[in-house]
């Protein structure tokens, strides 16, 4: 987008709108694809084979819903703040080139530890890593709330990606184990809800940014972090580790 910013600005009166449109359509397509192309014969769509397992699955349905909610809120918060950052960068008088630098830091945080994080989640449990992830997410939002200048944005967006990564890998692992143990399509539904949440974040971003601004959005991020942290305690009886 940056390389052709003048062209997009003349065409749409905004060089950023193309990126938002691509992301919005992509997330909607991804959500539909997960549901459409998951085979009906997949073991994840099969009903429980043993009555005892079925009863346990029913008892744990609330835990499964909480896991899905945690995953969706974590991703939704990241997408909203990440997507609002280019708007904020323009509002403080910086160029679109800075957006690329900030998003690069953010992407580094999202994926730098991904190759090794999964093994540690399996070893030490998803809950420990989700506690760490929600704490990092809170610190990220607090950083950009206190100071939303270029340097603070680089640090804050890096931490935002890092916290998201911890939470996403850990909660996704828990959902996968839950789906296999209780033979439910929870991971399919969860992925679909994540993509729909991203679609919603992009479609409502303009209005939410206009109403509460960037600091308002990161304030919501802090509240979501606290909510995630507290709801983890409700999963004490979930025996999947």
Give the role of each language-model region.
Residues 166-179:
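Intracellular juxtamembrane helix-capping segments at the cytosolic ends
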Residues 182-211:
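A late C-terminal transmembrane helix in Major Facilitator Superfamily
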Residues 6, 113-125, 209:
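Helix-to-loop junctions at the C-terminal end of transmembrane segments
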Residues 61-81, 158:
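Pair of pore-lining "gating" transmembrane helices in MFS-fold secondary transporters
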Residues 1-35:
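Helix-loop-helix hairpin linking two adjacent transmembrane segments in secondary transporters
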Residues 140, 151-159:
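Paired small-residue
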Residues 128-143, 222:
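Structural signature of the two symmetry-related core transmembrane helices
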Residues 83-99:
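Short amphipathic helix-loop junctions that connect adjacent transmembrane helices
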